Design a protein with these regions (language model features):
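Membrane-interfacial amphipathic/re-entrant helices at transmembrane-helix boundaries
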Residues: 1-20, 49, 58-65, 90-95, ...
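Inter-helical junctions in multi-pass inner-membrane proteins, predominant
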Residues: 2-17, 155-161, 188-231, 251-261
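Membrane-embedded helix boundary and interhelical linker motif in transport proteins
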Residues: 9, 31-78
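Helix-loop-helix "hairpin" substructures at the membrane interface of multi-pass membrane proteins
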Residues: 14, 133-209, 233-238
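Short, non-helical or kinked segments that cap or interrupt transmembrane helices
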Residues: 16, 25-47, 89-94, 163, ...
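Alpha-helical transmembrane segments within multi-pass membrane transporters and channels
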Residues: 25, 58-101, 108, 239-243, ...
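Transmembrane helix-bundle core of multi-pass membrane transporters
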Residues: 82, 86-157, 184-187, 282-286
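Cytosolic-side transmembrane-helix boundaries in multi-pass membrane proteins
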Residues: 89, 112, 151, 169-183, ...
Length: 286
């Protein structure tokens, strides 16, 4: 059994991946204005890309990140342009269609790689501090998550982020001033899909890789976005980190089977106490 300090460090790294997932989902909800239930499938896609690279002797997390992001972006743009944009005014159709895509992906993954969980070698430690092992994938995951959160926060507070903010607030005005709203929507969908795949590729060495592995991260990212709000990106980041820590510590102290139940209980309690989410409680921040 690993020491508690190791569990806490791994929880931070897990939370960083959850933060990436939640950031991508927040982009889709804010700009495209749909609930994308296929978001978890892109997370799974990233994990399988990392697995395929590892089985071919490429053990670089950076290579996995770039390849997973590129493939997921292409699929995301295709899905956003060919399906999401045409039916986005019908939320039920979007939900059913995106869920159908996720199920289709799970079935294809099962045909290609089987239903049994796969694993990736954790590799040599990046560093060891007082017996606590720091893995490359975890460090990169944390750095990427911090960089993306910082970039998104900066973008939304600068003129360069005006198109996204304007589309999120009023699409008619955005179209009236000459913005290609439809193009921005499907490119945003592609970018968010790429972020989800990066999260999956970075977390792949620490989890069992299976066709349905994206379901729990999808649920947790939805919870994070609902609780934190779509515009409070740093609130979103820290809440995701907290969920990662809570997940790992509860699995360590209790049992893995209780971990996600405890997470759902805590967040449901949070939403009961603050129905409008954490963002409404901190109007002056980020």
């Amino acid at each position: 059994m690993p020491p508690l300090a190791q569990v806490l460090v791994d929880g931070i790294f897990t939370g960083a991946s959850y933060a990436l997932m939640a950031a991508g989902l927040a982009l889709i909800l804010g700009v495209v204005k749909v609930i994308n239930l296929s978001h978890g499938a892109f997370f799974t896609l990233g994990a399988y890309v990392a697995y395929l690279l590892e089985t071919r002797g490429v053990e670089s997390p950076v290579a996995a990140v770039f390849m997973a992001a590129g493939i997921a972006f292409a699929f995301g743009v295709f899905l956003g342009k060919s399906f999401i944009n045409p039916v986005r005014s019908h939320p039920f159709s979007v939900a059913v269609g995106s869920l159908g895509f996720a199920i289709l992906f799970e079935q294809v993954a099962q045909i290609l790689w089987g239903a049994h969980p796969l694993s990736i070698d954790l590799g040599t430690p990046w560093a060891t501090l007082n017996g606590v092992v720091l893995r490359r994938w975890g460090v990169i995951s944390l750095l990427v998550s911090l960089a993306l959160t910082g970039a998104l926060s900066l973008l939304l507070s600068r003129p360069g982020g005006l198109p996204l903010k304007l589309i999120a607030e009023d699409e008619e005005i955005a179209g009236a001033v000459g913005m290609d709203v439809e193009k921005i929507r499907y490119l945003t969908f592609g970018a968010a899909s790429a972020v989800a795949a990066v999260a999956g590729a970075l977390l792949a060495p620490a989890v069992a890789i299976a066709p349905t592995m994206g379901r729990v991260p999808l649920i947790l990212s939805l919870i994070v976005v609902i609780a934190s709000g779509m515009e409070k990106v740093w609130t979103l980041f820290f809440l995701a980190m907290g969920l990662g820590l809570l997940s790992n510590v509860s699995a360590y102290l209790l049992a893995p089977s209780w971990s996600y139940l405890l997470l759902l209980f805590v967040v449901c309690l949070l939403l009961v106490l603050r129905p409008s989410g954490l963002a409404a409680a901190e109007p002056g921040r980020d």
